[in-house]
């Protein structure tokens, strides 16, 4: 199957630009569905695997190509819960020259190596409300880690 035809369920796309979801002003793609249900989650509307809208990787790619920035963060929800779509979207965005960040509540060990090698930035770790921070860049709680490739 062509990567562009792969189905993906997203909550939405913030193309207005975020400076909180990785280096530089970035668009954010919010994947739909998350089993973690972290108390205090910033995006609880993304939890239901049936919410949001089903679309194609190609439609998401086209939407992002129409935006001026070539920086994008894939967040959610939990992107790792849609591995086929995540791999296809990352492949398409890399082909288009995007700087990609992936936000996951999982640990570094939970991220498949092919995905970890295909993105420039990773945010790992579940949000813990008692550890909430506003002083550590690009994370919501101090237990989370933000990784950048050299």
PLM ranges: what are they?
Residues 1-30, 35, 39, 43-49:
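N-terminal [4Fe-4S]-dependent radical SAM core
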Residues 2-11, 129, 142-150:
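Acidic, low-complexity intrinsically disordered segments
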Residues 44-72:
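Conserved alpha-helical substructure of the radical SAM core
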Residues 48-59, 80-116, 121:
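Canonical radical SAM enzyme core domain
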Residues 68-74, 94, 129-133:
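Conserved C-terminal portion of the radical SAM core fold
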Residues 76, 104-106, 125-127:
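Short secondary-structure boundary segments
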Residues 80-91, 132-150:
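P-loop/Walker A phosphate-binding loop and immediately adjacent motor/lid segment at beta-alpha junctions
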């Amino acid at each position: 199957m062509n990567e562009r035809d792969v189905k993906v369920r997203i909550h939405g796309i913030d193309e207005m630009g975020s400076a909180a979801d990785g280096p530089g002003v970035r668009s954010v793609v919010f994947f739909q569905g998350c089993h973690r249900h972290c108390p205090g989650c910033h995006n609880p509307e993304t939890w239901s695997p049936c919410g949001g809208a089903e679309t194609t990787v190609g439609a998401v790619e086209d939407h992002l190509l129409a935006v001026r920035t070539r920086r994008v963060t894939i967040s959610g929800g939990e992107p790792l819960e849609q591995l086929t779509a995540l791999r296809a979207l990352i492949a398409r965005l890399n082909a288009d020259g995007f700087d990609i960040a992936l936000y996951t509540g999982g640990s570094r060990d939970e991220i498949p190596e092919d995905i970890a090698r295909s993105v420039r930035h990773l945010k790992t770790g579940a949000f813990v409300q008692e550890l909430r921070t506003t002083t550590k860049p690009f994370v919501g709680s101090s237990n989370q880690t933000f990784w950048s490739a050299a």
